[in-house]
Amino acid sequence: PKDLIEEVFNELARRWVPIFNHYQDNGVDIGFELHPGEDLFDGATWEMFLDKVKGHKAAMINYDPSHFLLQQLDYLAFIDLYYDRINAFHVKDAEFNPNGRQGVYSGYQPWLNRAGRFRSLGDGQVDFKGIFSKLLEYGYNSWAVLEWECCIKSPEQGAAEGAPFIAGHIID
């Protein structure tokens, strides 16, 4: 129906603004992890939401480049646009290898067989040197948290490799 999306974002604002106000009164921000399949999943939906909540200062972004890579969104340009709203960073890798049978939506295949899938840090296609550099350029001084989901390696291997990977990318 006409105006359905507008109605949805108005309802999101109605529900979130009181929460933002309470959190702000207590010195806490909320970092939204923009994710495919959620109400907020890219810059356009973020801007629609931010407009409806009148730019509330407690509304922030938990930046996860793997979600943007799987959507084929320019995750480095995203930082340029929204750096002042990024308050957390999930260091998570992914790869996107489309073929003649599947693309972004991956045809309901198991993770191992999807065109887009999460990988251990350094095994995917995310440019972490570019991300860490760009965040530093904008004065980012907050969390860089390992989030791990890999369809090939074990969680133990992911953790053992992930911590030194992040440490090696942090710029002093």
Task: List each model region and its residues.
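Active-site beta-loop-alpha junctions enriched in small/polar residues
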Residues: 33-37, 64-68, 92-94, 147-151
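C-terminal helical cap(s) of enzyme catalytic domains, especially alpha/beta-barrels
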Residues: 155-172
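Active-site acidic/histidine proton-transfer and metal-coordination neighborhood
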Residues: 1-60
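Gly/Pro-rich active-site loop or hairpin
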Residues: 9, 39, 43-47, 51, ...
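Conserved, mostly hydrophobic/aromatic
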Residues: 30, 46, 64, 89, ...
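Short amphipathic alpha-helical/adjacent loop interface patches that line ligand
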Residues: 16, 86, 163
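A structural motif corresponding to the C-terminal end of an alpha-helix
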Residues: 15-30, 130-141, 170
